[in-house]
Amino acid sequence: MKTFDSQAENSPAVIGRSLRNRPLARKKLSEMVEEELEQMIRRKEFGEGEQLPSERELMAFFNVGRPSVREALAALKRKGLVQINNGERARVSRPSADTIIGELSGMAKDFLAHPGGIAHFEQLRLFFESSLVRYAAENATDAQIDLLAKALEINSQSLDDNALFIRSDVDFHRVLAEIPGNPIFKAIHVALLDWLIAARPTVPDRELYEHNSVSYQQHIAIVDAIRQRDPDAADRALQTHLNSVSATWHALGQQSKRKK
């Protein structure tokens, strides 16, 4: 029986033979075009707002077909490096926070579908918004607190309309996310709520009315604590609220499964 020689296995000759047996995957033409155009944009050969050459000109320049050019431009659009409008040449743009977060959307939705995925995202939301309310209690201006109060008022007017209440609920929490003035916070928050709401079960409206009223009262407690400049109280109020929301939707989801 042959003995295993780790030094022989790791010798350059053996590694070299192994690599020769594993040919590198060739890049698609569209990927090569994408990379070259991206580098040209980053080198400022095409400035922000400037149009790229036409598809026909790009085909001639890179010596590729139209599908390769279109795939490359579509990839650059997903990265936020170009904007594409029907009938116009692609125009160079600057990636935004929304673009960055949007790239994660597909992976996030896949993760939500895994066992425990929703609970993990709810915990992420709790950690994130906990920091937001503490910041708001310590730093929000009077004008920002007034915006929270206006969002709360709209919240109160939509208790009997579930679709409107969900929108006003999201708007209330969005105002919280905007208080630090960081566009990345806002983009993360918008995406996080979109992902969680999309993952919620479909339930009859009548089962949500009581939940709406409870959420509204909890929103009041959050705003009151922020007005009092009490970050600990604001954090407790928020955690009570989000834990209640999670428990309610978990219970509604279980009911929905039993009825099927």
Swiss-Prot record:
UniProt keywords, alphabetically: DNA-binding, Repressor, Transcription, Transcription regulation
GO molecular function: DNA binding; DNA-binding transcription factor activity
DNA-binding region: 55-74
SUPFAM superfamilies found in the cross-reference section: GntR ligand-binding domain-like, Winged helix' DNA-binding domain
One GO term (biological process): negative regulation of DNA-templated transcription
NCBIfam families cross-referenced by the UniProt entry: PRK03837.1
PANTHER family membership: HTH-TYPE TRANSCRIPTIONAL REPRESSOR NANR, TRANSCRIPTIONAL REGULATOR, GNTR FAMILY
Function according to Swiss-Prot or TrEMBL: Transcriptional repressor that controls expression of the genes required for the catabolism of sialic acids.
Protein's recorded name: HTH-type transcriptional repressor NanR
Protein's organism: Citrobacter rodentium (strain ICC168) (Citrobacter freundii biotype 4280)
